[in-house]
Structure formats: structure tokens, C-alpha cells
Amino acid sequence: MAAALRSSCAAARRLLRISPAALSTLTAASSRPAAVAPLARPIAAAAVSGGNNAFSWNLRRLFSSNEKHLPAISDPEVESAFKDLMAASWTGLPDSLVIEAKKAASKATDDKAGKEALLNVFRAAEACEEFGGVLVTLRMALDDLCGITGENVGPLPGYIEDAVKSAYKRYMKYLESFGPEENYLRKKVENELGTKMIHLKMRCSGVGSEWGKITLIGTSGISGSYVELRA
């Protein structure tokens, strides 16, 4: 399993991955052909297509209670892409949102700090999308082992147990990589991945007490809720 070290701003290094060998064994052992499908990028039906439609304006208004916790961004285009990313679900990033973010991140602007904040959020979104797919694949493998009604419940095979433990370590190390000034981003990641981690916990008895650190809604310490932002 690769190490997950980062410098203070190097969000690109925060890739959450179970080791290739473990994932290869996991997907090969799962009897469900579509097990690796979550790693693909679906096109969402209700995509956030840009900064000028009514849906995008509603998302901006929902950010009002959290403005003081977000980085200051002076460039309007960069700010719009940043807020649209924060308000979107990272389970499947819409292509239109990816295009918007890349366009804003590649433009020439004097707002270097705002551009860096956008890049950090975009990298985190892509990492969560990828790792979320791995967690779904792992959950599906557990479901296949247990059976529809739990008739096959028994000790976990070693490769599954190793994958579950690896997923937990990757998740916690990723959260710990965020600095105090990135609390808003940490909470967003908790929101996106916490539920998927809880799904794994629910399917495995005897997990360590450290799993109690995983929260379903990571909004403690900030006003408002990112769940509301995606409503």
C-alpha cells in the first residue's frame, strides 16, 4: 500500500487507493460483473452546467451560512467554479462541472490564492470520486459473500479483511492530511466518503473501536450543512 504524504498545499498527492494487488484480487473474486463500474465517470442527469442558471444561483445562496469558513476568492469565474464543486456530489462528477473547473483553473488571473483553492478542491473531488468507487466495489464484494439474506455470513477471507483495513487506513490518513485552514474541505470529504465507510462497518462484525471515529455527516465545527448544499 503506497504511502500518503503531502506538503501543505500538494492536494494532488492525496490519492486514496487500496494497493493494486489487493484491488485486483478483490475485483477478481467478486462474482458481480459490474463490480468495477463505480470507477467510471457517469454523466449526471441533473448536472451543474455553469454559473448562470437558476440551479447554480440556488447553490450559491445555500453557501451564505458558510461563507466565513471558505477561502477568499476575488475572481468571479474561479469563485463560481469553486462553489459549484463544493455544492456538487462527488460520487459522479458531471462532465460539465469538470469542464467548468478546468476552464477556471487554466485562466490567467491575479487571484493566485483563489486559483490554488479551486485546484485543491478539484483534486480532492477527483480523489473522492475514485476512492468512493473502490469503497462501493468493496461493499459489493461483501454483499456477494454474505448472500442476499445473510445466509452465507462467516469469517472474512484474508484478502477482503486486508482490503477493509486498508480502506480505513487510507481514509483516516487522508483526513489527517488537511491543515486547519482546510477544515471546510475535510468536512466535505467526510460527507462524501463517510457514509460509504459506514456501509463497510455495518457489514463487518468485530471491527476495531477506531471505526467509531468515522462520522456520517462531517459538519461539526461549522455552521450549516453540506447536505443542505446538495439538496
From Swiss-Prot:
Topology term for the membrane: Peripheral membrane protein
Location of the protein in the cell: Mitochondrion inner membrane
One Pfam family in the UniProt entry: SDH5_plant
Pathway: Carbohydrate metabolism; tricarboxylic acid cycle
Residue runs in coiled coils: none
Top-level lineage group: Eukaryota
Signal sequence residues: none
GO CC annotation, single: respiratory chain complex II (succinate dehydrogenase)
One GO term (biological process): tricarboxylic acid cycle
Keywords for this protein: Membrane, Mitochondrion, Mitochondrion inner membrane, Transit peptide, Tricarboxylic acid cycle
Membrane spanning residue stretches: none
Targeting presequence: 1-63
Subunit structure, as described in the record: Component of complex II composed of eight subunits in plants: four classical SDH subunits SDH1, SDH2, SDH3 and SDH4 (a flavoprotein (FP), an iron-sulfur protein (IP), and a cytochrome b composed of a large and a small subunit.), as well as four subunits unknown in mitochondria from bacteria and heterotrophic eukaryotes.
Name of this chain's protein: Succinate dehydrogenase subunit 5, mitochondrial
Protein species of origin: Oryza sativa subsp. japonica (Rice)
